[in-house]
Amino acid sequence: MKQISGNKLLVKALKEEGVEYLFGYPGACTIDISDELYKQDDVKIILPRHEQALVHEADAYARTTGKVGVCLVTSGPGATNLVTGLATANYDSVPLVCFTGQVARHLIGNDAFQEVDIVGITRSITKYGVTVRRREDLGRIIKEAFYIARTGRPGPVLIDLPKDVMAELGSAEYPKNVNIRGYKPNTDVHIGQLKRAIKLLNKAKRPLFLAGGGVVISRAHEIFREVVEKTKVPVVTTVMGKGSIPTDHPLYIGNLGMHGAYAANMAVSNCDLLFSIGTRFNDRITGKLHEFAPHAQIVHIDIDTASISRNIQVDIPIVSDAKEAITKMNEYVQECSTGKWLGQISQW
């Protein structure tokens, strides 16, 4: 069986995962990976002048394309310079896979030159992080990293690569499938819960859609616009949800919250149904929790179970991918009687 180094397998894995661009800054612990990348043309290298710029560039790439942003940095300061970017991606649900160089395994824990426990440092700001301790685990871990980053609620994954593991020869095979015990993200919408929510929507006198980043991340712009136009229900957005519907659309009111539009905040304060999709209800939009949407029943669709009823208690929780839920909604919704409500909003 053909054997190749871990460095070669990493480059092969990037190609298999369809990576077009890698944002990287070389250093001693990743120089051999850089050499392998130099030998091929499929994965293009974006070289910044600082690792912090690099991770923000990868973040921007992921947001604009919907693909996983990929980073490569060396150990020590190279790795620690990722921290702010990782925290940003984690907070905003941006899929990244960040590879960090690490000293050889026998030096880990011995205060070696440019050795830091980057997995430990970033544990609370990454979706998943791991140090590859065995060459035979490398392919599986890379495959899992991309899967975890892009599925469920997207987020950053950090893979720490000891220099000796990457130099070691091993299998050239890269896994085709992934099966992670205990990690089975739910994407299918519960039809019963969705129909309950739509029933409330049809009965409401002053309904309002709240679109968060989940609508944008799931690329649900077009189908969401169809639902809005079919129901004639007005829309407010979070900062992350801006762009989920054109800002010049007649049913779009504006951003909600402390940096939002007066009309949007008044609409939330006076609505009798707040139909929220893909938002965390953080303090920037809620203000005082006990005063938020005081007259409304609340529907909350979100792919992350932990986000539902964490800040605001909701009446109908639905765990689902935003696009999946909105697509199903489009099959059942009908035009709502919102003429009087829209007239009131226009006065604000």
What is the predicted function of each stretch?
Residues 30-32, 53-57, 77-86, 90, ...:
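Short glycine/serine/threonine-rich phosphate/pyrophosphate-binding segments
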Residues 20-59, 72, 189, 196-274:
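Anionic-ligand anchoring segments at beta-strand to alpha-helix junctions in alpha/beta enzyme folds, i.e.
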Residues 27-29, 103, 161-167, 213-215, ...:
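Glycine-rich beta-alpha junction loops
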Residues 148-203, 341-342:
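Conformationally flexible catalytic loops at phosphate/diphosphate-handling active centers
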Residues 2, 136, 172, 199, ...:
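Phosphate/pyrophosphate-binding active-site segments
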